[in-house]
Amino acid sequence: RLNQKKPVLAYMGNTAASGGYYVSAYARHIMSQPLTVTGSIGVVGVRLHTQGLYEKLGVNRVALNRGEHAGFFSDMRPLTPDERTTWENLIVHAYGQFKAVVAEGRQLPYDELDPICLGRVWTGRQALARQLVDSHGDFIDAVHKLAELADLPDPTSHDIPVVNLYAKQTRHVTPQPFEMAESLVSWL
C-alpha cells in the first residue's frame, strides 16, 4: 500500500534471499549488487522427532494434550499419516502464497514462476536476467534511484544521511539501520 503513495525501493546488499526477497517483492524497484545472493523463493518445513534422542539420554518427557490435533507440532512422536498430509499441504499452500506475492509484486505470470522459484538461489546478475531485480548498483546508486522515482531533486544537492560503514573496503555497503538511527532522526 505504501508503494501506491510513495515509491518503495528495495536495495539488496550481500544477501536478500527467501524472506528478504519476500519483503522486497512489492517494491517499485529492486536493486541488487551483481553478486547479491537472492531468490530462494520456496518453503521448507522442519519437524524434528526427538523421542529416541531423549530415551538415549535417559530423559523421560511427558506431554499432555487436549484435542485430537493438539500435539501436531510436538517433537515427542512421529507424525501420523494424516498429520504428514496436513504438513505437506501447509507447505504447498505457503509456497503458493509466496509465488503469488512474487507474481503480483514483480508482475510476472504465476504459472511461469516455478523455473525461477522452487527454492532456487541466484546471484544478483542471474536475478536480473530472470526479472527478479530491476537493476544493479550499490547503496549510493539506490539513494539516487529512489530520489529519481520520488521526483526529488538531485540527492547531491541536499543532505541525505548515508552512513557507509565499509568506506575503506568497498562502495557496496550494508547499512545498519540501528546504527544509522541517530542521523536519520536528525534528518527527519
What residue spans do the PLM features occupy?
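Conserved catalytic cores of soluble enzyme domains
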Residues: R1-V121, E148, D154
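Short acidic-hydrophobic, aromatic-tinged amphipathic segments that line or gate anion-handling sites
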Residues: M31-S32, V133-D141
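Intrinsically disordered, low-complexity segments enriched in small/flexible residues
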Residues: N65-E68, F72-D75, H93-G96, F139, ...
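Active-site-proximal helix/loop microenvironment
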Residues: L113-G137
